[in-house]
Amino acid sequence: MNQPSHRDHLRRLPESAYCGHAVVHWTLTIRERRTGWLSAEFYYHFRELLTHSQFRYAIACPILCLMPDHIHLMWLGLLTCSNQKLAMRHLRTRCNESLRRIGFEFQDQPYDHVLREEERQELTFVASCEYIARNPERAGLVGVDEYATYPFTGCLVPGYPELKPFESDYWTRFDRTVAWLRKNGLISGQQMNE
């Protein structure tokens, strides 16, 4: 039997589904689901690379979780010009450069789930983010209801390092921040003078 000479690719929605204020749950898997790459050093390097991709393409990440063999990211576009496919390509290229230095790389394509309108409603959206945050719990890396202690979970909104996903007022502050950024953009004179 002949084997295909090319790798199968995941089907994607139309380009427009990943643009503007789209909300997408991305999963990036290490090739062959190998482990051994995740460390505190890599986590902070990943956050640096993620910051550049998110700022460049106007993306916010209310929850991220690096697991031993894969990464979960919930992204939402901040501006009408936001493009998550370009942001993901940018991030994967930079991350793969770093991963290859230590003998790892991502699988060819990330998995994505573009959230439908009903999945973007506040309670459902927050529940989806909590599901991502509880990955370490389901994997037995932390105890039941100890997912907030997992050291490789966080959030990233460019310009707002003070946001912490497990603080009691997080979602109120996150929503206010995203609304402000959508209205005023990532850089404004007011921000620069504060």
Where are these regions (language model features)?
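Short catalytic/metal-binding and nucleic-acid-binding patches
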Residues: 1-194
